[in-house]
Design a protein with these regions (language model features):
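C-terminal hydrophobic helical "lid"/dimerization subdomain
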Residues: 2-3, 7, 254, 298-350
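Glycine-rich beta-strand-centered segment in the early N-terminal region that forms part
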Residues: 25-39, 52-102, 107, 129, ...
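NAD(P)H dinucleotide-binding glycine-rich loop of Rossmann-like/cofactor-binding domains
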Residues: 95-183
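Adenosine-nucleotide cofactor-binding segment
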Residues: 176-185, 195-255
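N-terminal Rossmann-fold NAD(P) dinucleotide-binding loop
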Residues: 189-190
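Helix-to-beta-strand junctions that scaffold the AdoMet/dcAdoMet cofactor pocket
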Residues: 260-261
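Glycine-centered, small-residue-biased loops immediately flanking beta-strands
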Residues: 264-265
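Rossmann-fold NAD(P)-binding glycine/threonine-rich loop
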Residues: 270-286, 298-306
């Protein structure tokens, strides 16, 4: 059984998003039905809507930073009750059997992660639709509890931007005594600054925009380096233990690899659509590394949400009605948002 839900969808890679009606499954024994209140706008929404990664399925309902209230629960649900704040991130199921799923690393499921949108359910036929919609039904195992201590609109982007930066910082045990460079001050970058600073690291913002210095320091950065200033970049050669690279546009890795100290690690969490050349000698000469990281598993995402609630950390957001989503996409591409658009889903219900 299914029921209809209002949404906004992209009909194709070249058309504007507009009103759409989708079908959600009725609540099963282990399901939670969430009345969506806010949904963040991730840069990857744009990549996928425009088929920049070459795997898009249409019509597409984007959105994987979903925050709302539980409206219904299945008769076997144990962790949620009606009225609870709940979140849904970048995936809604996994195989539940592979070593990574067993270890709480569902994002690296080896047998087929079920992404929140632009994918298919386990039957291989039913498309998944995201949070640019009024409701969603998800198994409680893949649903996150959200503290009422968090501002609900600022909590939504934590489901992607928050965990995408939290997970690698925790994996590499970043903390006091470490020097961390954050490349790019956008949705991911501003969370990387906040989190790295909260862990006790000395944080430097690396940006090509001098106008971002004041904001970077307000967010918690201790230093700011203008990447177009060659002299300033030379002064930080062999300096950082870690760089968190959040940039989704093509950029020159060698410029930043040379700022890493011996055994320094460049953590890539942005997803440029085109391959990037890697200069071998920038790695060889100081035993530097380039690594990647993809969001986080359910246990770690819950840990991140709890940590943010305890430490008063949330995303800086601009709330928009869904009718402005196409204009918002253009503003994201221009860097004209501080620092995450969040859709007020009430605008879709009217």
């Amino acid at each position: 059984m299914t029921y209809n839900t209002k949404a906004y969808a992209a009909p194709s890679a070249t058309e504007r998003l507009g009103p759409f009606t989708l079908s959600r499954r009725e609540v099963g024994a282990h399901d939670v039905q969430i009345d969506i209140v806010y949904c963040g706008v991730c840069h990857s929404d744009i990549h996928q809507v425009r088929n920049e990664w070459g795997n898009s399925i249409y019509p597409m309902v984007p959105g994987h930073e979903i925050l709302g209230r539980v409206e219904k629960v299945g008769n076997q649900v144990k962790q949620f009750k009606v009225g609870d704040l709940a979140g849904v991130g970048c995936f809604v199921d996994s195989c539940r059997e592979c070593p990574n799923c067993a270890a709480g690393l569902e994002q690296y499921c080896r047998n087929g992660l079920i992404v929140t949108y632009n994918g298919y359910e386990k039957d291989g036929k039913t498309p998944t639709y995201g949070g640019y919609s009024t409701q969603i039904v998800v198994d409680e195992k893949y649903t996150l509890k959200v503290s009422p201590n968090l501002p609900i609109e600022g909590a939504a982007p934590l489901l992607c931007a928050g965990i995408t930066t939290y997970s690698p910082l925790r994996h590499w045990k970043v903390g006091k005594g470490h020097k961390v460079g954050v490349l790019g001050l956008g949705g991911l970058g501003h969370m990387a600054v906040k989190l790295a600073a909260s862990f006790g690291a000395e944080v430097t913002m690396l940006s090509g925009s001098p106008s971002k210095e004041t904001d970077a320091k307000r967010l918690g950065a201790h230093h700011f380096v203008l990447t177009s200033d060659d002299a300033a970049m030379n002064r930080i050669s062999n300096h950082f233990n870690f760089i968190v690279d959040t940039v989704s546009a093509p950029h020159d890795y060698s410029k930043y690899l040379n700022t890493l100290d011996t055994d320094g690690v460049m953590i890539c969490v942005g997803a440029p659509p085109e391959p990037t050349p890697i200069p071998a000698f920038s790695l060889l000469l100081q035993r530097r590394s380039i690594v990647g990281s993809l969001i986080g598993g359910i246990p770690e995402t819950q840990e991140m949400l709890d940590y943010c609630a305890q430490h008063g950390i949330s995303s800086d957001v601009e709330i928009i009605p869904i009718q402005q989503i196409n204009e918002a996409y253009e503003r994201v591409l221009k860097g004209d948002v501080k620092y995450r658009f969040v859709i007020d889903i009430a605008s879709l219900k009217n």
